[in-house]
Design a protein with these regions (language model features):
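OB-fold (S1/OB) nucleic-acid-binding surfaces
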Residues: 21-50
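Short acidic/polar mixed-charge low-complexity motifs
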Residues: 46-48, 64, 79
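Hydrophobic residues positioned within well-ordered beta-strands of beta-sheet architectures
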Residues: 18, 39, 68-69
């Protein structure tokens, strides 16, 4: 069963099954670990930043409906909070242009702190911005 984007929380586990539409994609960059790019994705409940690696950068475009299995929502290099396939996950194109979506809230813009009662869990501690600061909404 798919989880809505509004319900994902940071974790160091590959356990997210979801689907979304890619709204926008940044130009790929090349680092020591290979090619990567960020994308803005959304479903009917929220938006999120997606990290695409290697061939994923070329495989997906704005308007694509994507299914993510065994995804992970975590900080990349202790800075950006992104949803990604990781080493054990998989992204697959399901179709194009046939899904309702919202651009707010953007769950990548939520501030999260470790739960004092359980260090494996995170709790919300505020919102940096309701919209993506990387992919600002059109006026």
């Amino acid at each position: 069963m798919y989880v809505f984007l509004k319900d994902i929380v940071p974790a160091a586990q590959n356990n997210i099954y979801t689907r979304f539409i890619i709204l926008d994609k940044a130009k790929p960059g090349v680092a020591a670990s290979g090619k990567s790019c960020l994308a803005l994705a959304a479903d009917e409940t929220a938006a999120v930043h997606i990290q695409l690696w290697g061939e994923e950068c070329d495989a997906f475009e704005a308007g694509d409906i994507v299914k993510l299995t065994n995804g992970i929502f975590s900080y990349v290099r202790n800075s950006a909070l992104v949803l990604r396939a990781g080493k054990r996950g998989k992204m697959e194109k399901m179709g194009e242009f046939t899904i309702a979506f919202v651009e707010t809230p953007n769950v990548s813009e939520i501030l999260w702190n470790p739960d004092p009662g359980n260090s494996k869990l995170y709790i919300q501690n505020g919102v940096t911005s309701p919209y993506s600061r990387i992919f600002p909404p059109l006026p």
